[in-house]
């Protein structure tokens, strides 16, 4: 049924309403809303007020609560869920002071666990909720005041304001610091030497090694003359004598259960970003297939019966054989990690089993990862046999030593059910000490030391966890916001020039903004609130004092800070030299909101280049060898793409021949116009009339992929079908068919109100969107991604942008 436009589920005398995330938020009073009229420092001491963020849900909840005899709060079982529950509690109490209110907690949405949770309810944890509220207030104070200060100082307002926050700043500094290490790295030359050894026609590779000054084995030779001497000795020898043979057996223990961080790490290994992995996991949890995906726990609770879950999996079609093989064991003892908490169990499958047909390919891939991790935790250890062989060579000036390490998987153990870890073997034949081996093909390889690797998303999350930056529930969202704001690009994330400028300015004028100690201390304070050892007011007052000290330093250096940021912003937008003047080409924005490349010498020089209409441009480090212009990348969610050199793109668009499709329906047979696939200077494409501008009839076309005509002809319009093929990413060809029919179908979809026509939006997600006030595709397209994402659990701004891109 509908209550004030909100879907409510009814059975018997019970009614259930979904809150769809926070329904009440914190904000500053309206008199602080004008960025230009209010000094940012005033926000440090400004009072914070609560206000409904989803008024329709609030109204529905109040109406239902007035006559309710009993209220159960069953929000997510974590800090944010407890705060959402407290928001509901306070709204109910405004209209109903008598009805009992209890708290129901569960970690998986299965019939058994939900039924048991409602049979044994608890009280709301107001301390835990206060910790969540403290986080809200602190994030608002730091984020709003610092974002306004930096943006105003740099005169960078509108959609391109400079965003900063208490968790975002330290995370960005981690990425920038690593990039500085890479830039400052001075590679050193070294050499490695190898030779092939043979016994009974079985050849294996051995590497040269020596003992360094610390009596430790080393295989890198830092002096070229020494490397040459070793090579001469190896190349001049025909045999090597076995000096040492060592055999050992190694136990390879199964992995610990998944917590959030380790899940993200494993998901990245199969190609999923942190944000995408968590989004999929949230959907699987909501569908009842896995337990709650936000957890620090790596120890299964005592009430989890692995054998029962294996029985359920054994009855399923996809994991039955693997689960059945594990049930044969007399004793099933799961592994345990180092972290044990009492809120949520580690991530594992429930006994609600989907089939591949129930899930998308991505969802099934992540679900299988979770299932197989559980199977691995109750499987036996694997066993490896290792063989180390050391052989010496008799040379004229020195007797170099060679070593080879062989390994063989004797018992696969958990690897049989968990194929995500390497089981590659290295064969070395059995030899005996004193045995002579034939030596052939000596070789020397010149190498250089490599700079430290950039943080991959999963490793960045692990580092944030170790340093106390953010929480299990927020770290992946923080990284996604860095992408959304244009602070990082690529994977692994690489800082843009703007990111460097913000970090440099923060370090110089107020280093607390990017200090991990500050955000880690605040996280510790919030945990103290949850334990009842501190109060919300104590923590927020402490945070105000810290923020006031930051503003003392910032205010003293406002002019210098603004200059520094403006220089960084200009560098971040400078594409390269203008071909028609002595000025630079920079990325600009038209008064209509679209991006283009224009000369910094305007109006004296009016040279411009178009940019694609989809996405937000950022500059890459790669430079066009022909024009000296930086390559441009367009950020557009999952449809992000590299546009390349804007001058090359414009020239290519002008040179690309049109592909004639057929007669133009506007011109008619006597008009002589033909429809052709045309490439625009912006990089886009359309099907348009060859008589343009006399005839401006056109139809949209996908930007990417190669267009070709098919043999099938439209019976209604007499036009051949169009097929789009993709050579670079393995996607299946897209048969558009007749371009006129295709466009009519597109218009029909756009005119519709069905949200589920968008890829990634199923029935449950569509319901969440409607509860957040988005009723149809048109409403989705006009929504502000960050605001909408804040209202829907498990959905990030990038996901919203992907939906909007699909809707376009």
Cite the ranges covered by each PLM segment:
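Intrinsically disordered, low-complexity regulatory segments
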Residues: 1-132
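C-terminal or mid-to-C-terminal helical accessory/interaction module adjacent to the motor/catalytic core
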Residues: 53, 67, 109-197, 247-248
């Amino acid at each position: 049924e509908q209550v004030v436009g909100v879907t409510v589920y009814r059975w018997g005398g019970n009614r259930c309403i979904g809150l769809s995330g926070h329904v009440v938020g914190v904000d500053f009073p309206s008199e602080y809303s004008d960025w230009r009229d209010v000094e940012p420092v005033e926000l440090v001491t400004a009072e914070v007020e609560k206000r409904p963020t989803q008024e329709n849900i609030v109204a529905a909840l109040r109406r239902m609560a007035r006559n309710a005899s009993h209220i159960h709060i069953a929000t997510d079982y974590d800090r944010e869920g407890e705060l959402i529950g407290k928001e509901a509690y306070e709204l109910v109490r405004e209209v109903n002071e008598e009805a009992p209110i209890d708290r129901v907690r569960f970690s998986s949405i299965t019939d058994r666990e939900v039924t048991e949770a409602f049979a044994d309810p608890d009280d709301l944890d107001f301390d835990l909720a206060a910790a969540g509220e403290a986080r809200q207030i602190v994030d608002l104070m730091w984020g709003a005041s610092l974002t306004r200060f930096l943006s105003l100082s740099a005169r960078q307002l509108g959609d391109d304001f400079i965003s900063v926050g208490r968790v975002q700043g330290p995370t960005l500094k981690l990425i920038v610091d690593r990039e500085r290490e890479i830039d400052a790295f001075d590679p050193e030359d070294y050499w490695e030497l190898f030779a092939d050894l043979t016994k009974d026609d079985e050849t294996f590779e051995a590497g040269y090694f020596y003992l360094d000054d610390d009596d430790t084995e080393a295989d890198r030779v830092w002096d070229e003359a020494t490397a040459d001497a070793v090579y001469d000795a190896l190349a001049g020898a025909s045999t090597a004598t076995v000096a040492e043979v060592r055999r050992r057996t190694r136990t390879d223990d199964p992995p610990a259960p998944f917590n959030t961080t380790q899940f993200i790490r494993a998901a990245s290994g199969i190609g999923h970003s942190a944000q995408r992995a968590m989004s999929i996991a949230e959907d699987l949890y909501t569908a009842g297939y896995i337990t709650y995906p936000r957890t620090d726990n790596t120890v299964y609770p005592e009430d989890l019966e692995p054998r029962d879950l294996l029985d359920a999996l054994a009855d399923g079609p996809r994991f039955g054989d693997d689960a059945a093989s594990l049930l044969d064991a007399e004793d099933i003892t799961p592994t345990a990690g180092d972290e044990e908490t009492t809120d949520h169990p580690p991530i594992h499958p429930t006994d609600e089993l989907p089939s591949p047909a129930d899930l998308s390919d991505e969802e099934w891939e992540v679900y299988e990862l979770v299932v197989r991790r559980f199977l691995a935790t109750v499987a036996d250890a694997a066993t490896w046999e290792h063989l180390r062989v050391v052989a010496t060579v008799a040379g004229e000036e020195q007797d170099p030593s060679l070593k080879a390490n062989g390994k063989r998987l004797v018992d696969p153990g958990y690897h049989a059910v968990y194929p995500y870890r390497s089981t590659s073997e290295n064969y070395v034949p059995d030899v005996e000490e004193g045995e002579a081996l034939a030596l052939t093909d000596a070789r020397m390889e010149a190498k250089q030391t490599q700079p430290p690797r950039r943080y991959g998303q999963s490793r960045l999350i692990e580092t944030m966890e170790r340093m106390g930056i953010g929480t299990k529930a927020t770290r992946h969202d923080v990284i996604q916001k860095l992408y959304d704001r244009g602070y990082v690009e690529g994977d692994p994330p690489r800082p843009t020039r703007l990111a460097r400028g913000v970090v440099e300015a923060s370090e110089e004028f107020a280093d607390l903004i990017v200090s991990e100690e500050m955000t880690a201390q605040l996280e510790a304070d919030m945990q103290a609130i949850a334990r009842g050892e501190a109060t919300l007011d104590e923590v927020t007052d402490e945070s105000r004092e810290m923020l006031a000290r930051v503003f003392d330093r910032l205010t003293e250096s406002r002019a210098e800070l603004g200059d520094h940021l403006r220089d960084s912003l200009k560098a971040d937008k400078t594409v390269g030299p203008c071909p028609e003047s002595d000025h630079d080409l920079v990325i600009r924005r038209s008064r209509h909101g679209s991006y283009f490349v224009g000369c910094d010498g305007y109006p004296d020089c009016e040279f411009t280049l178009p940019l694609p209409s989809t996405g937000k441009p950022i500059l890459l480090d790669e430079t066009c060898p022909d024009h000296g212009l930086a390559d441009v990348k367009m950020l557009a969610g999952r449809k992000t793409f590299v546009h390349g050199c804007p001058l090359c793109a414009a020239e290519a668009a002008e040179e690309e021949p049109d592909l004639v499709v057929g007669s133009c329906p506007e011109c008619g047979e006597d008009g002589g116009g033909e429809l052709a696939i045309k490439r625009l200077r912006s990089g886009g494409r359309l099907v348009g009339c060859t008589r343009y501008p006399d005839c401006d009839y056109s139809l949209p076309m996908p930007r990417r992929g190669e267009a070709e005509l098919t043999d099938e002809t439209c019976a209604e319009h007499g036009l051949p079908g169009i097929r789009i093929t993709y050579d670079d990413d393995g996607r299946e060809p897209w048969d558009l068919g007749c371009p006129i029919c295709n466009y009519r179908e597109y218009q029909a979809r756009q005119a519709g109100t069905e949200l589920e026509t968008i890829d990634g939006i199923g029935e449950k997600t569509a319901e969440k969107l409607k509860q957040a006030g988005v009723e149809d595709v048109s409403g989705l397209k006009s929504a502000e991604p960050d605001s909408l994402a804040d209202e829907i659990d498990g959905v990030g701004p990038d996901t919203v942008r992907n939906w909007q891109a699909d809707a376009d």
